[in-house]
């Protein structure tokens, strides 16, 4: 309760400050969240801030992020989507992106290469950021961060990073009309951010950190991100109408709010599909242990009750006749009173993932924490170090993508593995495509377009772009990023 009170107290304090500023000036009041935002804060119990509550009082919103390398790109993207959703239609900026140099004092990590700098910058843009601010121009001369985080040399002279930022800035000037006004596809999949569950994880261990909760969310998000499937991040208090989503994923929902649990019942009854981690609703509205798990009456909806639960690191699970060894698990749950179908089983034949029809919808309950089994393991702040475990679970990937296909979610528009693609389209018939090759090998493929265009022009990079059959053909070097302008037919 004290942590939730602190979040409310912070929100009230910044609302007061915003009112004072507005009493003195008519210009927009702008602020941003620290270190990746609440969804990637591993010390959320200690810092106790809620982006959704804080963003409400400002005219524009943003967040800061300090990814160390391109391997942190999915965590950066997740932070961007969370910030976009917290802004709730307001313009949001990437307000403090690393300028490309990591480290301070005598512990320097050196400058990023151009490919990594462009990757992280364009990742922010393609997830909704309408502007980029970097920390910072020159190296600090004193203080805890002396010598670090600079885009320029000691005296403000040019580096590869400042030159790269210049090229990126020129591209944004030429194409800002499309990137600002162009529409991205609406998200058909949503991932829950349960801030109460983050706090439960933070309080439940002696380390006072909630890294496992971040990994739970990131693992699911990463599977979708790798397939260019747009995602909304749902806050358990500020979620609106759920009926537009084909699939809602519930990572680390042990203390999900009662209001969201009730909304889920309506969503499933109306034909929606949910996929939940184990231990759903284990804590009630007062954060006391529930009398039954799943909580909030969801045993009927999931078609089973929990029999036993324990921590675990590895399990063998059979899914569609294939055996998968799953590691990095936070929870292992077994079931009783099972009325649901077994979507997957443990090695002993008992149900591991349950699927149950309820109303006109479908509720899937996993006995293992699928998100934790495929998390990037990265943080984009400096609160604690990541554990370095970058996991890739074929089971999690298959389950999530099979569910997306079953629910009719729009498939990946790009046929080149490892390439991230975003298509912007405007009402006047113009467009832009952002391409990022995250692989260490060259990539060649096509991106499906929703309209036909007269021509295309290469605005950043050298992607060998051409148009054919309502698709953009491209060829990218390893780790290359590119932007292609699509020109309207007249």
Residue ranges with predicted function:
Residues 1, 43-49, 206, 292-295:
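Aromatic- and acidic-residue-enriched segments that line the glycan-binding/catalytic groove
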Residues 1-32, 45, 53-57:
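Active-site neighborhood of glycoside hydrolase catalytic domains
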Residues 15, 23, 27, 55, ...:
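Carbohydrate-binding surfaces of carbohydrate-active enzymes
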Residues 39-54, 243:
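Distinct, well-ordered alpha-helical segments
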């Amino acid at each position: 309760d004290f942590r939730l009170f602190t979040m409310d107290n912070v929100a009230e304090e910044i609302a007061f400050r915003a009112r004072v500023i507005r009493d003195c000036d008519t210009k927009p009041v702008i602020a941003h969240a620290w270190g990746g935002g609440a969804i990637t804060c591993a010390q959320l119990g200690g810092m106790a801030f809620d982006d959704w509550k804080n963003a409400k009082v400002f005219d524009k919103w943003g967040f800061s992020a300090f990814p160390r390398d391109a391997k942190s790109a999915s965590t950066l993207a997740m932070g961007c989507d969370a910030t976009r959703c917290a802004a709730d239609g307001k313009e949001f900026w990437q307000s403090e992106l690393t300028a490309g140099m990591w480290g301070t004092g005598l512990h320097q990590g050196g400058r990023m290469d151009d490919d990594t700098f462009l990757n992280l910058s364009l990742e922010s843009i393609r997830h909704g950021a309408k502007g980029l601010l970097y920390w910072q121009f020159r190296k600090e001369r004193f203080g805890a961060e002396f010598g670090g985080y600079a885009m320029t040399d000691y005296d403000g002279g040019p580096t590869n990073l400042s030159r790269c930022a210049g090229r990126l800035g020129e591209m944004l000037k030429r194409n800002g009309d499309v990137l600002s006004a162009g529409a991205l596809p609406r998200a058909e999949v949503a991932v829950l951010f349960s801030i109460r569950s983050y706090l439960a994880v933070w309080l439940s261990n002696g380390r006072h950190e909630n890294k496992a909760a971040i990994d739970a969310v990131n693992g699911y998000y990463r599977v979708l991100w790798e397939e260019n499937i747009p995602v909304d991040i749902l806050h358990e208090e500020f979620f609106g109408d759920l009926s537009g989503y084909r699939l809602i994923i519930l990572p680390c929902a042990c203390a999900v709010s009662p209001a969201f649990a009730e909304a889920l019942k309506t969503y499933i009854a109306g034909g929606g599909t949910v996929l939940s981690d184990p231990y759903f609703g284990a804590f009630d509205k007062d954060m006391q242990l529930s009398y039954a798990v799943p909580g909030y009456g969801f045993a009927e909806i999931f078609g089973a009750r929990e029999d036993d639960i324990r921590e675990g690191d590895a399990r063998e699970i059979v899914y569609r006749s294939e055996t998968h060894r799953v590691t990095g698990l936070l929870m292992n749950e077994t079931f009783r009173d099972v009325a649901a179908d077994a979507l997957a089983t443990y090695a002993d034949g008992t149900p591991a993932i349950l699927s149950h029809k309820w109303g006109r919808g479908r509720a899937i309950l996993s006995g293992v924490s699928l998100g934790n089994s495929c998390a990037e393991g990265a943080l984009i702040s400096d609160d604690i170090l990541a554990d370095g475990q970058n996991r890739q679970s074929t089971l999690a990937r298959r389950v999530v993508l099979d569910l997306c296909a079953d629910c009719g979610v729009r498939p990946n528009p790009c046929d080149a593995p490892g390439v991230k693609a975003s298509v912007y389209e405007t009402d006047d018939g113009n467009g832009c495509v952002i391409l990022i090759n995250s692989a260490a090998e060259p990539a060649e493929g096509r991106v499906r377009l929703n309209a036909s265009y007269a021509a295309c022009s290469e605005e950043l990079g050298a992607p060998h772009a051409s148009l054919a059959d309502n698709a953009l053909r491209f060829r990218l070097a390893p780790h290359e990023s590119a932007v292609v302008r699509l020109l309207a037919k007249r």
